[in-house]
């Protein structure tokens, strides 16, 4: 028997690929009890008195060897391309090393403390049987992956196994092995429970730092503690790995994570174990790249990481976005509904029907929508909060209830059906010197700066907020304010002059320069609330001088293009081509002004006016551009023509209304999306009919305009401004607020909303 065992050992040593370390693995047992078996066999054979001494010396040698092999063998095993089974280590590239480990593991079942296994002084046949079975198992596994040299070992081992092994001992050995495995698992679980919670370690560094510690995570559960070796060896390996990882990772990073050897007792994945064992981790202690761990962890709603971990915070919030979307700005977001001076979307459903419907819900059809890139920001340097006019005492302070929120421009909707038809009356015409447009306009080329720095900002801000609160009666002052720091420019009160003639104004003042320069010159009369103007180019003959293009390059300037009835007699196909070309400009927001003028100042024949007016209506509707309508002493004919060519729900600006309410009422009824523009004529004491009409027209259907350079406000001395300009529209806004008995801030916001709805600004 001894000679056969020596032969087997010799063959194993010779096929270890010339590696003396692997060959020495057989001669260095890895535990005390297995290492005593050769000594016991020698003692039983010789019966000499030297057996106890030899046994003691061998034990001491084995104790020193066990710790060394627990790391060395696993390192060789991890570096090889071997495949391991759940219970037995399979063949590796280093055959001798794997065989040595297999014999060591098999012996471990006979010596694990705490298991009722065989005593160390078992009979020779039992010891031989155990070792031969190990050889047999090793040789059987090597048959599938190694050469014919390994087959020779298998034949010898099978012969020995057939001669010695007994069936009843095999069964008992299997039961002992299972018990030993169970105790090992329990012990390792205890180690994990104690050490796993006290060792911070990041998953990303686990594999790198565990390689020298024999803790690399294998694909099939490979690792030093995975082998069914003695409990002491497993304990030593586990303790070594944990201590090493703890020393290296204690000061490194957060994240309490399981180590690879903690997966020994179970086949559950490494990531699942992490989640189960460490469910109470802080959100900032996140493993890099482990999304499942991040998702499954519960964390407080506000946790700030450094920039390097920002993507992890984003990943966290994706799974909790229902609960904590916008966690850092939630209060600001909830306060939006309390802002009276918010900027509203043009898509808001508003009923403008004058029928007896106290709570209108929506327009008859959708608005005519335009691409957002057509518009530039109306606020650049004029974004500061409304401070020049005193707030009424009824204007709520910061923090008012949200029930009073978002009522801007809605207060008079309930009065939509209050007005009733009256007998038609004559239009009070205010004389305007439109012939000035035919005078010598400056045709000189003008130098303007082109600036669209805030064009994209307008696209973002255009639909900042959609008002969805129900309407309230006219008397209710349901507005509130916030400090400047809480308001964006788009949410602040301001106005846009919806109709002016910058080309005529520049000509009258002999001004050459940019609109920015013009505002600086007249800065004393341009209030902070000014947010832009729509310049109307109503003489197609002037579209060839390129002045309009230079003006539209300016911030806070938009354009409308059409043919005024005063110039309809000059209308031609070439002018129409120029007109349509100008309307293709991104900042061209309307078609007009156009219409009918039966006053003595208009020299164009009426039939010619009708023809040009009808042609422009058809073009405008085909282009889906809002209409800018001029009408003087021709209201009935105007309505009849518009009914033929304009849909009832079309967006219309009835420009510079100065007449009585019965004149405008039929248009308001037939065109629910029509808005009425009022100028500084309201400030004149003689314009009592216009003020009376203003009282009866709902605030939500009113817009402000200057019609500059005409209609200088009564309060403005000519020494300050000889002609009206867009900044002076604030005087008209104040008069509208006075006539409507509304706070100035609410009136400003309502007019701004109406402008946005009509022109999508």
From Swiss-Prot:
The keyword Phosphoprotein does not apply. InterPro entries: DNase_TatD-rel_CS (IPR018228), Metal_Hydrolase (IPR032466), TatD-like (IPR001130). GO terms for cellular component: nucleoplasm. PROSITE patterns: TATD_1, TATD_2, TATD_3. Its cofactor is Mg(2+). It is an enzyme of class 3 (hydrolase). GO terms for molecular function: metal ion binding; nuclease activity. It comes from Homo sapiens (Human). The gene is TATDN2. No activity in the presence of Ca(2+). Mild activity in the presence of Mn(2+). Mg(2+)-dependent 3'RNA exonuclease and endonuclease that resolves R-loops via specific degradation of R-loop RNA stucture. Shows no activity against D-loop and minimal activity against the RNA strand of an RNA-DNA hybrid duplex oligomer. Has no 3' or 5' exonuclease activity, no uracil glycosylase activity, and no 5' flap endonuclease activity on DNA substrates. May have a role in maintaining genomic stability through its role in R-loop resolution. A divalent metal cation 1 binds at residues 499, 501, 593, 707. Residues 33-52, 66-85, 388-402 have a biased composition (Low complexity). Residues 417-431 have a biased composition (Polar residues). Its EC number is 3.1.13.-. The keyword Nuclease applies. This is 3'-5' RNA nuclease TATDN2. Residues 1-90, 135-181, 197-294, 318-337, 343-364, 388-486 are annotated as: Disordered. Keywords: Exonuclease, Hydrolase, Metal-binding, Nuclease, Nucleus. Changing residue 705 to A: Completely abrogates R-loop RNA exonuclease activity. It comes from the Eukaryota. Belongs to the metallo-dependent hydrolases superfamily. TatD-type hydrolase family. Residues 247-294, 452-470 have a biased composition (Basic and acidic residues). It is found in: Nucleus. A divalent metal cation 2 binds at residues 593, 630, 655. Its main location: nucleus.
